[in-house]
């Protein structure tokens, strides 16, 4: 195994705007192009079929049965609800469903559907067998959600024409379609909406073994040479999340191209992850800030989510949906009726001795 302490790497200083390298692009143009390139790379890393999809074996097998049965009957599959933390493959799975069915995919998000008319316009443009993907479906406005009930059940909607006493309702038949909804907050879905999904699946965090396969596959797609132990190292720091694994791989690739002739070995991976502030547990700056606010600022808790978010300068939803699921899974934070509490594991991770009686202390 490579010894990182014996390997020296050079981290280049950033080039200032006043430096010798000039560009005809403005900062906004550069940012837009970089974001576009990152998006294209992310898309290229997505598996296209169920056979290519790594991990989530139960969801994959169940969904294969649902899709195969529908195709054999020549009908649109039941509507699908995918729930779970961000980055586990919900959007990718929606793309795969459309691919497996050989149909078109239309994509939108809950916050974008503010009015019933917004949804009606999208539904009326669907062709038979199309897949409609609504991300963050729990954030749909109520009028749009109520229109969706009838669309999901009867493949029709009532369009209101006019206002006041003279308003009339015109029924509009829809082509049979499959709705795929994704949510990170399944508890916020209303009962009537949840009940209209014929198949629901909970996406789980990935084990290191499956994440290693994700990293190896992504490296092959990107044309990056990587050692197996380096792939394991990246996977073990990816918080059980493929999206994070792919992102870390790209950052390690950048580091290796500057410092290791483009080849990623264990030492290069470890050094790169230190540079990008990802520790051995996969915690980043925000995760550690949450733990420090909880432990150093409030004695380990309990602390309410709003207070915790204020302490780290983030929205409560960010702390609750991005940081908390992994911190809970890693055994560092527990949720109680009075608020969040840091465990002994969290204290020790910050190099502190946990008080007696704390959860997980000896």
From Swiss-Prot:
Binding site for Mg(2+): 91
Enzyme Commission number(s) of this protein: 3.6.4.-
Annotated CDD domains: AAA
Broad class of enzyme this protein falls into: hydrolase
Domain of life: Bacteria
Region of interest: Large ATPase domain (RuvB-L): 13-206
InterPro entries (alphabetical): AAA+_ATPase, AAA_lid_4, DNA_helicase_Holl-junc_RuvB, P-loop_NTPase, RuvB-like_N, RuvB_C, WH-like_DNA-bd_sf, WH_DNA-bd_sf
Positions that bind DNA: 335, 340
Compartment(s) of residence: Cytoplasm
Small ATPAse domain (RuvB-S), as annotated region: 207-277
GO cellular component, one term: Holliday junction resolvase complex
Catalysed reactions, as listed in the record: ATP + H2O = ADP + phosphate + H(+)
UniProt entry keywords in alphabetical sequence: ATP-binding, Cytoplasm, DNA damage, DNA recombination, DNA repair, DNA-binding, Hydrolase, Nucleotide-binding
Positions bound to ATP: 45-46, 87, 90-92, 153-155, 196, 206, 243
Region (Disordered): 1-27
Region (Head domain (RuvB-H)): 280-362
PANTHER family according to UniProt: HOLLIDAY JUNCTION BRANCH MIGRATION COMPLEX SUBUNIT RUVB (PTHR42848:SF1), PTHR42848
Domain note: Has 3 domains, the large (RuvB-L) and small ATPase (RuvB-S) domains and the C-terminal head (RuvB-H) domain. The head domain binds DNA, while the ATPase domains jointly bind ATP, ADP or are empty depending on the state of the subunit in the translocation cycle. During a single DNA translocation step the structure of each domain remains the same, but their relative positions change.
NCBIfam families according to UniProt: PRK00080.1, ruvB
Subunit composition and interactions: Homohexamer. Forms an RuvA(8)-RuvB(12)-Holliday junction (HJ) complex. HJ DNA is sandwiched between 2 RuvA tetramers; dsDNA enters through RuvA and exits via RuvB. An RuvB hexamer assembles on each DNA strand where it exits the tetramer. Each RuvB hexamer is contacted by two RuvA subunits (via domain III) on 2 adjacent RuvB subunits; this complex drives branch migration. In the full resolvosome a probable DNA-RuvA(4)-RuvB(12)-RuvC(2) complex forms which resolves the HJ.
Name the record gives this protein: Holliday junction branch migration complex subunit RuvB
Organism: Corynebacterium diphtheriae (strain ATCC 700971 / NCTC 13129 / Biotype gravis)
Gene: ruvB
């Amino acid at each position: 195994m490579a010894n990182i302490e014996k390997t020296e790497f050079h981290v280049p200083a950033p080039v200032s705007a006043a430096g010798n390298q000039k560009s005809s692009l403005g900062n906004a143009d550069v940012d837009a192009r970089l974001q576009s390139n990152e998006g294209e790379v992310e898309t290229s890393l997505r598996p296209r079929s169920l056979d290519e999809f790594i991990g989530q074996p139960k969801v994959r097998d169940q969904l294969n049965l649902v899709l195969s049965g529908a195709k054999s009957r020549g009908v649109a599959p039941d509507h699908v609800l995918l729930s779970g933390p961000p980055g586990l493959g919900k959007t990718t799975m929606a793309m795969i469903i459309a691919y497996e069915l050989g149909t078109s995919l239309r994509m939108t998000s809950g916050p974008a559907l503010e009015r019933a008319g917004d949804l009606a316009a999208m539904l009326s443009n669907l062709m038979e067998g199309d897949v409609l993907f609504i991300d963050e479906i729990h954030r749909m406005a109520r009028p749009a959600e109520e229109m969706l009930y009838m669309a999901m059940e009867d493949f029709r909607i009532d369009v209101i024409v006019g206002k006041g006493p003279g308003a009339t309702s015109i029924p509009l038949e829809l082509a049979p379609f499959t709705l795929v909804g994704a949510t990170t907050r399944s508890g916020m879905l209303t009962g009537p909406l949840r009940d209209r999904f014929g198949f629901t699946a909970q996406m789980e965090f990935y084990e290191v073994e499956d994440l290693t396969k994700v990293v190896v596959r992504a490296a092959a797609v990107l044309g990056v040479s990587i050692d197996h132990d380096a792939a394991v190292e990246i996977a073990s720091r990816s918080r059980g999340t493929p999206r994070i694994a792919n992102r870390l791989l790209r950052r390690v690739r950048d580091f290796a191209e500057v410092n290791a002739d483009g080849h990623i070995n264990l030492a290069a991976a470890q050094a790169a992850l230190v540079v990008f502030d990802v520790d051995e547990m996969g915690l980043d700056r925000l995760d550690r800030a949450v733990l420090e606010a909880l432990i150093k600022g409030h004695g380990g808790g309990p602390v309410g989510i709003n207070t915790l978010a204020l302490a780290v300068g983030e929205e409560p939803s960010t702390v609750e949906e991005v940081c908390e699921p992994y911190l809970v899974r890693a055994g560092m934070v527990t949720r109680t009726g009075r608020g969040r509490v840091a465990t002994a594991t969290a204290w020790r991770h910050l190099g502190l001795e946990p008080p007696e009686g704390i959860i997980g202390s000896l």
